[in-house]
Amino acid sequence: MSKELIVSKIENGTVIDHIPAGRALMVLRVLGITGREGLRIALVMNVDSRKLGKKDIVKIEGRELTPEEVNIISAVAPTATINIVKNFEVIKKFKVSPPEVIRGRFKCRNPMCITNAPREPVVPTFYLVKREPPLFVCAYCGRYHELSDLI
């Protein structure tokens, strides 16, 4: 494996590393990043990794992810590591974990849930009930969802 960089370092922003191979696009989707935001985004897929065999990497220049965004990544990339970069240096590094509460990001899979009624201005809300594997319950109808089922 070559030691040269495939994608250059970023000055300020977020690097999402150790994403399971083939899941980088899903990470962008759960973050709501479409590419139209004007951010410089670097995506590297299926690179060699001692830890995972193969992995994906996402670099987002000029944006630091919120704690909620960081933890929502665990839905599609439970092995991900988040690096916050300032002046080309990593200033914070942490692993993702399922959030305690998810509000307004996903729809309840129960078609009869009040959150799916077109005339009801109710924000879908899910509470974590089990960490491994992550299991959530809808605050309104009580239906259980695995985190990966919500995306």
Curated annotation (Swiss-Prot):
A Pfam family that this protein carries is: PyrI_C
Top-rank lineage group of the source organism: Archaea
Q: Which cofactor does it need?
A: Zn(2+)
An example of a GO molecular function for this protein is: metal ion binding
What's in the GO CC field? aspartate carbamoyltransferase complex
For biological process, the GO terms are: 'de novo' pyrimidine nucleobase biosynthetic process; pyrimidine nucleotide biosynthetic process
Q: Where is the signal peptide?
A: none
The record's similarity note reads:
Belongs to the PyrI family.
Which PANTHER family does UniProt cross-reference here?
A: ASPARTATE CARBAMOYLTRANSFERASE REGULATORY CHAIN (PTHR35805:SF1)
What is the official name of this protein in its record? Aspartate carbamoyltransferase regulatory chain
